[in-house]
Amino acid sequence: MNRILIIAGGTGGHIFPALAVARELREQEVDVQWLGVKGGLEEKLVPDSFPLHLIQIKAFRGKRGLQQLLMPLRLVRAVFQAYRIIRQFKPDVILGMGGYVAGPGGLAAWITRTPLIIHEQNSIPGLTNRVLAKMAKFILQGFPDTFPQNRKVITTGNPVRTELVKMPLPQVRLAARRGPLRILVLGGSQGARSINQKMLAALSSYPRSEEIAVWHQTGQRDFEFIQKEYEKIKIEAKVDNFISDMAGAYGWADLVVCRAGALTVCEIASVGVASIFIPYPHAVDNHQFHNARFLEQAGAAIIISEESLTETDLMRWFEQFAQDRDRLLTMAENARKLAKPEAVQRVIAQCKKFYAAR
């Protein structure tokens, strides 16, 4: 049986694409194990069916004083921990899907001379992947032109969940749809307070509440407050702290209001749905803005910076879309044209090149 070690952690934007690949690999009877970080989100999201190895490492950026001085020692410790795991498992290939666990994991792959493939989900590569690119056999990218083109760079698209890839096309879902404008609000798996607040402000002053229906993922922190506020403003609303059925949510929606993490952008393209992106302003290298541009330039999305975002802007867009379903459908179809439904298979195809004969 062939063996692959997947390295991914930290955020859903790294973990969910890796899970999509891992599940397909398991269907192909590959022995898949996972390398993550102690205390990371991967401890909650990676199913028990995938053996999960955890090392100790924290993000490097923003450290000062003693913490900065200790980082080299902590990196060495993490690399040694990853090294032991790799030597024990003996994978044919290591697939790095991002998160700060990828740094020590990738270095350990290089030390053990295990083939390393990295995948960059964002349109602007992170520091870790820029370093690991020099050691990797292949550099896979979710968006075109993330890395300078050379023989090692392959645009695979970003892997998304199978149930999203298999959803009906926009014209099937949306062409005959009537009734209120259905707005899906997402702030990432942790929620986004500024989006939550601006949405409430916009909807509370919306003149015709019967024209709007909302499904709002708030994050745990704001859940109770947002739920009570929707009751006050008399808008038809479903409020969840976390949405596990994303296929159901995207299928329900006419319009998505969200951040512009790589996973969200590619899920929206895979499904084919109109969107308003509010990029996280503190994302490293402003990568969320560049992710969103991928859809905006194709006429599939609107971008509003958080700095300039007002409830008046949102209300104006909602009014326009509520009266113009043809535009919603056109944006959804434009998004779907950019989808890479075969992304999982493209990633696996590169891994297969290093399978050992067993």
From Swiss-Prot:
GO cellular component, one term: plasma membrane
GO biological process: carbohydrate metabolic process; cell division; cell wall organization; lipid glycosylation; peptidoglycan biosynthetic process; regulation of cell shape
Enzyme class: transferase
Topology versus the membrane: Peripheral membrane protein
Compartments reported by the entry: Cell inner membrane
Family annotation (SUPFAM superfamilies): UDP-Glycosyltransferase/glycogen phosphorylase
Annotated binding of UDP-N-acetyl-alpha-D-glucosamine, by residue: T11, G12, G13, N122, R161, S189, I243, A262, L263, T264, V265, C266, E267, Q288
Matches recorded under InterPro entries: GlcNAc_MurG (IPR006009), Glyco_trans_28_C (IPR007235), GlycoTrans_28_N (IPR004276)
Protein name: UDP-N-acetylglucosamine--N-acetylmuramyl-(pentapeptide) pyrophosphoryl-undecaprenol N-acetylglucosamine transferase
Recorded family membership: Belongs to the glycosyltransferase 28 family. MurG subfamily.
Gene it is expressed from: murG
Pfam families listed in its UniProt record: Glyco_tran_28_C, Glyco_transf_28
Keywords: Cell cycle, Cell division, Cell inner membrane, Cell membrane, Cell shape, Cell wall biogenesis/degradation, Glycosyltransferase, Membrane, Peptidoglycan synthesis, Transferase
Main localization category: membrane
UniProt pathway: Cell wall biogenesis; peptidoglycan biosynthesis
The organism's taxonomic lineage, starting at the top: Bacteria, Pseudomonadati, Pseudomonadota, Gammaproteobacteria, Legionellales
EC number from the UniProt entry: 2.4.1.227
Organism per entry: Coxiella burnetii (strain RSA 493 / Nine Mile phase I)
Gene3D superfamilies given in the database record: Glycogen Phosphorylase B
